[in-house]
A protein has these predicted regions:
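Helix-to-beta-strand junctions that scaffold the AdoMet/dcAdoMet cofactor pocket
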Residues: 69-71
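Short strand-turn motif at the edge of the Rossmann-like AdoMet-binding core
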Residues: 78-82, 108-110
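Rossmann-fold NAD(P)-binding glycine/threonine-rich loop
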Residues: 80-102, 120-121
Length: 172
């Protein structure tokens, strides 16, 4: 979204500073911790949110986002959640806010070939605009496909990993 000139605010659980918050800062994005600021407080502090792209995997956040969304705003839900989380929500306030505020909520999955190509193009642009930044995302290298157990361990347990990747073949 920074590549498209948008102001970006990332809202996540972990308190900064840490690697992700620093990387976002390098792009000119703001990082806010849910441990320090509610989404509603962030909306008041930085102005109403025109677009919220929810990808946390924490379903209650979708309803908080619905309340924090500004007039004429769009809430995009992109995470598939499992489990049976239950929260109490003020459905009348959310409904009224969406109707009178002309808000939109949509769900999306970006799984087509065109989405993949668009993603690759954005990665190329990101490298041009922010040289070297993408390599900082590649935090955990796994050598060979036969080390899938190690890859899964990092994906599940390594809280410092941003992107775990498999080096399929050595160059040469």
């Amino acid at each position: 979204m920074r590549l498209r000139g948008l102001e970006v605010i990332c809202y996540s659980r972990r308190v900064p500073p840490y690697r992700n918050s620093e990387l976002l800062g390098e792009l000119g994005a703001r990082y806010i911790s849910s441990q320090q600021t509610t989404l509603t407080e962030a909306s008041k502090q930085f102005g109403p949110f025109d677009l919220i792209f929810e990808a946390s995997g924490f379903s209650p956040l979708a309803f908080q986002a619905a309340e924090a969304l500004g007039k004429n705003g769009v809430l995009v839900l992109s995470s598939v959640t499992g489990g049976e989380k239950k929260v109490e929500v003020n459905t009348d306030r959310i409904n009224q806010g969406f109707v009178l505020g002309n808000k939109v909520m949509v769900g999306t999955v970006n799984a087509s070939r065109a989405d993949f190509i668009s993603g690759v193009n954005d990665l190329v642009k990101a490298e041009a605009f922010y040289p070297g930044w993408l390599n900082k995302l590649l935090t955990t290298r796994i050598d060979g496909l036969d080390n899938y157990a190690e890859m899964l361990r990092h994906l599940i347990e390594d809280k410092e990993a941003i992107k775990v990747y498999v080096e399929v073949a050595q160059e040469g």
